[in-house]
UniProtKB/Swiss-Prot annotation:
One of its GO terms (cellular component) is cytoplasm. This is Peptide-N(4)-(N-acetyl-beta-glucosaminyl)asparagine amidase. Binds 1 zinc ion per subunit. CDD domains: TRX_family. Changing C251Y: Loss of PNGase activity. Disulfide bonds: none annotated. SMART domains: PAW (SM00613), TGc (SM00460). Residues 2-108 form the Thioredoxin domain. It comes from the Eukaryota. The gene is png-1. One of its GO terms (biological process) is cell redox homeostasis. Keywords: Cytoplasm, Endoplasmic reticulum, Hydrolase, Metal-binding, Zinc. The lineage of its organism: Eukaryota, Metazoa, Ecdysozoa, Nematoda, Chromadorea. InterPro entries: Galactose-bd-like_sf, Papain-like_cys_pep_sf, PAW_sf, Peptide_N_glycanase_PAW_dom, PNGase, Thioredoxin-like_sf, Thioredoxin_CS, Thioredoxin_domain. The active site is at C251 (nucleophile), H278, D295.
Length: 606
């Protein structure tokens, strides 16, 4: 703990009153004109860094005369040792060894109160205080009106209806719109003068008065253009209303702005802060009487094991901040609660629980009695749900539960790799022929399989991610161009070609096939790029039309496996890898309707 200079007796009394009975307090009485005082000063600083559960103070004898008189100081330096507000020892002169011996004699590494935090624990716990104000701003009626004004009218109308509403459907559409049309991810800026993308990390800057007042910016990242030395600023705004204007940021800005949109649609939410550097939301589903995980960055919901099982993170503390409560929700997002207890070593558990209880009480000021009872019942149900879900997860198994959980998708690949959030090496593949879901309803002789590049989902499980149903995949990525409002699959950066294939198990259909119709949208070639898609059945192969029309295969005989392969190659220059694409589609599509970027339709004979 750094050395603190005390300037008056009331200030010293305040420190003594707040100190734990076991806490050692050492006061260095000095004068600026005293040579030995200057000599011992850096050593005193070293002691303060070494002994965390002690308070090191300095008193200038020419300034704080009231303190000097209390302790009858007549020579400098003099060191007074206090414990439980009483003087327990004293050292006169700049005697390093004597000071060290007295510290060791009286020092206690832990507080007398088992629930009182040590200095290192206090430093760790400080991070949880700053988030408590975030959800309170969501209750501002002006902010909520601003939020509704930027959202699609149709979505607002569905959410604000007086009758029953499908909260999950509203959430899903809100996530999709927010991710694909409204908010953008900030990695590094592009220079407004020479259009060169900055390749270096930002420097820490100081927010201007305007950035602090209008946007609540607590810090600023400053970037210098590699080409023309232009300075670019990225203020880290905390005001969600300001984020409605800027519409860019990283996970903190995403979750903060999204939290305001949720409040504007009368969806009760929490702001979830994770000590391993991620932020997301939770929404209380009234129809299901439970809290639901929602991550606007990833455009996903109700997948709480995404971070541990998908990204490969080791979570420690996930704290949920509502407008009137603060709770620990870590158990919802982990695989093994017993293991978590052994890994939490930053703060003792009783200290953490005591701290969180006080923080929750402060957040709950002004609660009505009915609201207190409501939250108490919810919390009991939530804890029971977490325990039941963990037991259910273990029955399913670690491998199987990760079938539709991949690595992080927001941010550059380099950035995600540095953070260790890519998940398992390479995307997860089905790596076996697709067994089409059996038909339902009156169309018993018709099967359909499709992929939507906008939502990056398939029509049957495993649904999430373009690789989830692929048989083979090499050097292919999904790209969202927010500036052009387009999304597609293309090669990864470099010269190597890209390939992706899907195999369909036709033998398992157990019926003769009348015809197969295959359609692949958005096959695009630019400059010298090459894009080709072929379908192979038995001993023959056919090219898929590039104009989005269907390839129809009539009355296939003895069909067992249908193989569809897309190959991407060619291109030149820095963006050559993007000059061959499949599924190229405009992002701006309202209403959350699915698009058929890729479809396979099969009619069977009666």
């Amino acid at each position: 703990m750094p050395v603190t200079e005390v300037g008056s007796l009331p200030e010293l009394n305040n420190i003594l009153e707040r100190s734990d009975a076991n806490r050692l307090i050492i006061i260095d009485f000095f004068a600026n004109w005293c040579g030995p005082c200057r000599m011992i000063s850096p050593i005193f600083e070293q002691f303060s860094a070494e002994y965390g559960n002690a308070t090191f103070l300095k008193v200038n004898c020419d300034v704080a005369r009231d303190i000097v008189q209390r302790y009858n100081i007549s020579a400098m330096p003099t060191f007074i040792f206090l414990k439980n507000r009483q003087q327990v020892d004293m050292v006169r002169g700049a005697n390093q060894q004597a000071i060290a011996e007295k510290i060791r004699q009286h020092y206690s590494p832990t507080p007398a109160n088992p629930n009182a935090a040590s200095d290192s624990e206090k430093r760790f716990l400080e991070q949880f205080v700053k988030c408590s104000n975030v959800p309170r701003s969501y209750q501002d009626e002006v902010f909520k009106a601003l939020a509704r004004s930027v959202m699609p009218e149709e979505l607002v109308g569905r959410a604000m209806t007086e009758g029953p509403r499908d909260e999950k459907a509203i959430l899903k559409d809100l996530l999709h719109w927010f991710k694909t049309q409204f908010f953008t991810w900030f990695d590094r800026p592009t220079c407004p003068k020479c259009t060169l993308k900055c390749s270096t990390d930002g420097l820490q800057g100081t927010p201007t008065r305007e950035e602090q007042k209008e946007g609540g910016a607590s810090r600023v990242e400053v970037y210098i253009c590699d080409g023309c030395n232009t300075e670019m600023r990225f203020p880290r705004y905390n005001n969600p209303a300001k984020l409605l204007q800027t519409r860019t940021g990283r996970c903190g800005e995403w979750a903060n702005c999204f939290g305001l949109l949720l409040a504007a649609l009368n969806l009760e939410s929490r702001f979830i802060y994770d000590t391993t550097d991620h932020v997301w939301n939770e929404v209380y589903l009234l129809a299901e009487q439970r809290w639901c995980h929602v991550d606007p960055c990833e455009n996903t919901m109700d997948r709480p094991l995404l971070y541990t099982r998908g990204w490969g993170k080791t979570l420690g503390y996930c704290i949920g901040y509502g407008s009137d409560h603060v709770v620990d929700v870590t158990w919802r997002y982990i695989w093994d609660s017993k293991k978590l207890v052994t890994q939490r070593n930053e703060v003792r558990q009783p200290v953490f629980e005591n701290f969180l209880s006080k923080l929750n009480s402060r957040q709950a000021e002004g609660q009505t009695e009915p609201r207190k009872r409501e939250l108490a019942v919810r919390r009991v149900c939530e804890l029971m749900e977490m325990m039941a879900q963990e037991a259910k997860n273990h029955k399913i198994g670690w491998e199987k539960i990760g079938d539709d959980l991949g690595g992080r998708i927001t941010g550059s690949e380099e950035w995600r790799r540095e953070r260790g959030e890519l998940g398992e090496s390479g995307p997860k593949l089905l790596a076996e022929p697709i067994k089409l879901a059996p038909p339902t309803g009156p169309a018993q002789n018709y099967l359909e399989f499709n992929y939507d590049v906008i939502t990056d989902t398939y029509s049957q499980p495993p649904e999430i991610g373009f690789s989830a149903q692929a048989f083979e995949l090499e050097n292919v990525q999904r790209v969202e161009e927010t500036d052009w409002n387009m999304t597609y699959l293309c090669r990864k950066r470099g010269d190597a070609p890209g390939n992706i294939s899907w195999h369909f198990d036709l033998k398992s259909l157990k019926k003769s096939i009348e015809k197969i119709e295959i359609r692949m949208a958005g096959i695009q070639k630019f400059e010298k790029g090459k894009a080709m898609a072929i379908a192979c059945l038995g001993d023959s192969c056919m090219r898929l039309p590039i104009d989005c029309s269907a390839l129809t295969i009539e009355d296939p005989k003895n069909a067992e496996i249908l193989k569809i392969t897309a190959t991407l190659s060619g291109g030149e220059g820095a963006i050559g890898f993007q000059q061959a694409q499949i599924f190229r589609t405009e992002l701006k599509r309202g209403g959350g309707a699915r698009t058929e970027s890729f479809s396979v339709k099969i009619w069977m004979k009666n």
